[in-house]
């Protein structure tokens, strides 16, 4: 390995210029490898890393990049506030900030098991799911229409199974302070079907999302077979932009409603509701 170059440390701008000169040598065909880059140059490069995806890919470039981009100093800036991290079980111990970050990418419950949280792996943005118990579901307390069950596939203790109903109406409200500001979000209803699934194929199911008292963007959805990585299915309700911090724009409303003129003529059954998820647009 050749001798490592030095970088001018008289100021941030000078450091960057010195680092850029060294990188230019590599770009122009220098025989040196990325492992020859000095530590202070690697530190400057890592300081410009803006997303977890960037850090993960950069760590694959070389051994030196791996050491730098897997360091706690890089991954700590992707972690949410301490009160968010404190939601993880106290018994869990993490050997690095990167390990802690990826633990937060798996859903974990909060609000007495009525919500779940996780981070989007690529961006570090917050994802939230409202459980069925956090939603307003028409006649869900009546055992004639809905039955609460426990299934291993669910992240929640109980989920409602639709037995038979004419009026299908699900609504929810999310405080946008618990999701990431300055982010485009999508809302999805997460569900699965039973062998008794029926009635939805011919029912006009209208879904809407929008800020409270500011109107909803509405569309029609179908409970088709689009599967998620966790085995559930989902139907997109709509998109919104969370500006963050604006008075009067802190509550998002969602709805999934059968708007048939005569819903009693088309009974519906065979649906299990996991919840409504809010996640950054185009993420999975």
From Swiss-Prot:
InterPro entries: F-box-like_dom_sf, PP2-like. Residues 32-80 form the F-box domain. One of its GO terms (molecular function) is carbohydrate binding. PANTHER family: F-BOX DOMAIN-CONTAINING PROTEIN, F-BOX PROTEIN PP2-B2-RELATED. This is F-box protein PP2-B5. The lineage of its organism: Eukaryota, Viridiplantae, Streptophyta, Embryophyta, Tracheophyta. The gene is PP2B5.
């Amino acid at each position: 390995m050749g001798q490592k170059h030095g970088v001018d440390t008289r100021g941030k701008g000078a450091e960057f210029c010195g680092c850029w000169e060294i990188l230019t040598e590599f770009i122009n065909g220098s025989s040196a490898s990325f492992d020859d880059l000095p530590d202070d140059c690697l530190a400057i490069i890592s300081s410009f890393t803006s997303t977890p995806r960037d850090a993960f890919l950069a760590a694959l470039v070389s051994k030196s990049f791996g050491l730098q981009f897997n360091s706690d100093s890089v991954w700590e800036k992707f972690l949410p506030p301490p009160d968010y991290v404190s939601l993880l079980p106290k018994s869990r111990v993490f050997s690095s900030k990167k390990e802690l970050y990826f633990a937060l990418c798996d859903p974990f419950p909060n609000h007495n098991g009525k919500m779940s949280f996780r981070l989007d792996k690529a961006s570090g943005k917050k994802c939230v799911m409202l459980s069925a118990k956090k939603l307003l579901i028409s006649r869900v307390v009546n055992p004639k229409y809905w039955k609460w069950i426990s299934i291993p596939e669910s992240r929640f203790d109980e989920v409602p199974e639709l037995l038979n109903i004419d009026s299908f109406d699900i609504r929810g409200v999310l405080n946008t302070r618990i999701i990431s500001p300055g982010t485009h979000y999508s809302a999805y209803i997460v569900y699965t079907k039973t062998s008794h699934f029926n009635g939805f194929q011919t029912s006009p199911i209208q879904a809407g999302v929008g800020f409270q008292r500011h109107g909803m963007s509405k569309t029609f959805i179908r409970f088709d077979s689009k599967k998620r990585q966790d085995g559930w299915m989902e139907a997109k309700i709509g998109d919104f932009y969370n500006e963050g911090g604006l008075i009067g724009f802190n509550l998002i409303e969602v709805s999934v409603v059968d708007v048939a003129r005569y819903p009693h003529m088309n009974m519906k059954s065979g649906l299990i509701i996991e919840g409504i998820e809010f996640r950054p647009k185009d993420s999975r």
